[in-house]
């Protein structure tokens, strides 16, 4: 389930602090992010919630680390409860399942599209793929709501939360009313990265599947 969600989100979401004005509208803070944050690294926690509101039930929790350099380069690594790697070098997306010792390759252009990954790893042209508007403020977090313009995406609504100028969380809601919630800590924006930081090497003996 976790892998399906992240693959559908095209390697999913790597997040980071944004030093936007603390009281700016969420749309302004997002724009500061896409124009000012070219790379980042940090840690994430991901929760799967079945249902919404008070009736929502957490069905799974995972965590790990991320690093990215826009456009199209990122590493999203799960470390708990088990090890899985999603990595893109700007052209190809690699998904490595350590337990199966299996690598899946996908063309990156087709993977991003109207997914949440396009917000974080793609270009700055958000309005091409999303309807963007300010949402409510909850517990001090200002939310931005993005609705994909494409009709064939897995997520029908994407929420991005900011607090005191920093990216705090993302909510991905599917057509069945289930939510994937990501929260971010230890974020560093625009850190120095090695030239080969996103070069993927197939592990010894791994099976490779191309899609």
Curated annotation (Swiss-Prot):
Positions of disulphide bridges: none
GO BP term (any one): lipoprotein transport
Signal peptide extent: 1-24
Localisation: Periplasm
One cellular-component annotation, GO: outer membrane-bounded periplasmic space
Main location: periplasm
Coiled coil feature spans: none
The keyword Amino-acid biosynthesis appears for this protein: no
SUPFAM superfamilies linked to this entry: Prokaryotic lipoproteins and lipoprotein localization factors (SSF89392)
Keyword RNA-binding annotated: no
Function summary: Participates in the translocation of lipoproteins from the inner membrane to the outer membrane. Only forms a complex with a lipoprotein if the residue after the N-terminal Cys is not an aspartate (The Asp acts as a targeting signal to indicate that the lipoprotein should stay in the inner membrane).
Family: Belongs to the LolA family.
PANTHER family: OUTER-MEMBRANE LIPOPROTEIN CARRIER PROTEIN (PTHR35869:SF1)
Family annotation (NCBIfam families): lolA, PRK00031.1-3
Protein name: Outer-membrane lipoprotein carrier protein
Gene name as annotated: lolA
